[in-house]
UniProtKB/Swiss-Prot annotation:
The lineage of its organism: Bacteria, Bacillati, Bacillota, Bacilli, Lactobacillales. This is Acylphosphatase. InterPro entries: Acylphosphatase, Acylphosphatase-like_dom, Acylphosphatase-like_dom_sf, Acylphosphatase_CS. Residues 3-91 form the Acylphosphatase-like domain. Its EC number is 3.6.1.7. It comes from Lactobacillus gasseri (strain ATCC 33323 / DSM 20243 / BCRC 14619 / CIP 102991 / JCM 1131 / KCTC 3163 / NCIMB 11718 / NCTC 13722 / AM63). GO terms for molecular function: acylphosphatase activity. Keywords: Hydrolase. The gene is acyP. It is an enzyme of class 3 (hydrolase).
């Protein structure tokens, strides 16, 4: 099990980005959270097996929302993360 954090910038708020991120995560068996940040970016904590997590990251970088676009993803691996049981949108 691997955990990563992502800070996603671009047109990622107000375009269904969090909802589509949640749908992709659920389809791939990824757990964690996604939330909007005050600076217009989106933060994601994603946890899962190596291959599904790689697919998830690729889909995020390609922008899961057709109305939005991703300019940059700051990706970090977390070694001591809490265990998530589902993927949820944090409001």
């Amino acid at each position: 099990m691997k955990t990563v954090t992502m800070k996603v910038t671009g047109l990622v708020q107000g375009v269904g980005f969090r909802w589509t991120t949640q749908m992709i995560a659920q389809d791939l068996g990824i757990t964690g959270t996604v939330k909007n940040n005050p600076d217009g970016s989106v933060s994601i904590v994603a946890q899962g097996e190596e291959l599904p997590l790689e697919h998830f990251i690729k889909k995020i970088k390609a922008s899961p929302s057709v109305a939005g676009h991703v300019d940059h993803v700051d990706l970090n691996t977390v070694s001591d993360a809490e265990k998530f049981t589902r993927f949820s949108v944090v409001y």
